[in-house]
Swiss-Prot record:
UniProt record, GO biological process: protein quality control for misfolded or incompletely synthesized proteins; rescue of stalled ribosome
Active site: H19 (proton acceptor)
Gene Ontology molecular function: peptidyl-tRNA hydrolase activity; tRNA binding
Record protein name field: Peptidyl-tRNA hydrolase
Organism: Lachnoclostridium phytofermentans (strain ATCC 700394 / DSM 18823 / ISDg) (Clostridium phytofermentans)
Annotated site, Stabilizes the basic form of H active site to accept a proton, chain positions: D91
Length: 191
């Protein structure tokens, strides 16, 4: 069994913001795989199903971003999975809008949700899929930027990224993270 966790903030005011792209990815995975996100437990909204021939739990922690580790820890403990059996999906301002980066370990890179998960797990060795949301303009505050919605011109890149995340998760579950990294960690070149 695997647990796939998308990071974001609960409540309507944060829907469709850059920081909630992890929640959007979980919604896309649920839709693509006929999984109902209809259970509230372990400080998360969850759904059970199958992806890539593996049993999965999809989860959207409801603790607010900076406390995501509380929910992740509860999920891991309850379902008795190892840190190698989780995938965390979240926003990354260091990547171009829509670019994916899959990693199996690494620092939080300034992301407070990941920092909290690392603290609760006592390890940075877990699979994560970063979705590029672009760097903030010089005159923007970081919090205002990540809590802003995507402008219309970026929406096609985000839709495409969510489609790729769905395929990347299936690849990780079926073939492993290394194969997925080779397939999806490519920067698109516009010619």
């Amino acid at each position: 069994m695997y647990i796939i966790i998308g990071l974001g903030n609960p409540t309507r005011e944060y829907e469709a913001t850059r920081h909630n792209i992890g929640f959007d990815a979980i919604t896309r995975l649920a839709d693509d795989n006929n999984i109902s996100l209809d259970t509230k437990k372990h400080k998360a909204i969850c759904g059970k199903g199958m992806i890539g021939g593996e049993k999965v739990i999809l989860a959207k922690p409801q603790t607010y971003m900076n406390l995501s580790g509380e929910s992740v820890r509860e999920l891991i403990d309850f379902y008795k999975v190892t840190k190698e059996e989780i995938i965390v999906i979240y926003d990354d301002i260091s990547l171009d809008v829509g670019q994916l980066r899959i990693r199996t370990k690494g620092s939080a890179g300034g992301h407070n949700g990941i920092k909290n998960i690392i603290a609760h797990l006592g390890s940075d060795e877990f699979c994560r899929i970063k979705i590029g949301v672009g760097d903030k303009p010089k005159n923007w505050d970081l919090a205002d930027y990540v809590l802003a919605r995507f402008p219309k011109e970026e929406e096609p890149a985000i839709r495409e990224a969510l489609e790729k995340v769905s395929k990347a998760c299936e690849t990780i579950l079926r073939d492993g993270a290394k194969v997925a990294m080779n397939l999806f960690n490519k920067k698109e070149i516009n010619t």
